[in-house]
């Protein structure tokens, strides 16, 4: 019989659908912008060639680090365990929401490669909703784990990996 993954906290029931809609919209807009750039010639090839090398390195870093965060956070959270366990090691020791941050970094990396104002607006909306969802989950984790999670919040930043700001009180 397959083992069922046991969760400590809860997730908003519509969150998966919201993510699918936003990420799909982002991808469609990016693809449409690429087609329209080829069709209408804006921005010029010269502008793209001159800016591309400058933006390539941060884009690759954002995408690679984002993939790393998502991969490692999934491995930690979805590891088969007999009882649910609070994970505060690995990527969870540097940021409280590595899955969300990883996804945001991947999309931001693609924005560096091919900027689209509409896709940027979608990214901002996605960030705001990720922050809302993270806060929703944290309230539940505080209820379930109490002081253990409150201590974790004081040690580990919510979003900014290298930030000294740990949590809102």
Q: Which residues are covered by each model-predicted region?
A:
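Membrane-anchoring alpha-helices and their flanking helix-loop junctions
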Residues: 1-88, 104-169
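Membrane-interface loop-to-helix entry segments
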Residues: 91-105
């Amino acid at each position: 019989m397959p083992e069922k993954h046991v969760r400590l906290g809860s997730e908003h029931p519509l969150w998966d659908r919201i993510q699918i809609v936003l990420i799909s919209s982002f991808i469609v807009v990016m693809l449409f912008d690429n087609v329209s750039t080829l069709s209408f010639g804006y921005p010029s090839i010269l502008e793209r060639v001159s800016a591309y090398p400058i933006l390539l390195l941060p884009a690759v870093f954002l995408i690679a680090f984002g993939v790393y965060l998502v991969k490692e956070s999934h491995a930690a959270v979805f590891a088969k365990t007999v009882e649910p366990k609070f994970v505060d090691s690995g990527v969870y020791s540097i940021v409280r929401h590595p899955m969300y941050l990883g996804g945001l970094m991947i999309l931001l990396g693609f924005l560096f490669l091919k900027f689209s104002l509409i896709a940027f607006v979608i990214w901002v909306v996605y960030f705001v909703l990720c922050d809302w969802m993270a806060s929703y989950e944290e309230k539940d984790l505080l209820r379930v784990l109490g002081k253990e999670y409150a201590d974790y919040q004081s040690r580990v930043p919510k979003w900014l990996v290298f930030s000294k700001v740990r949590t809102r009180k």
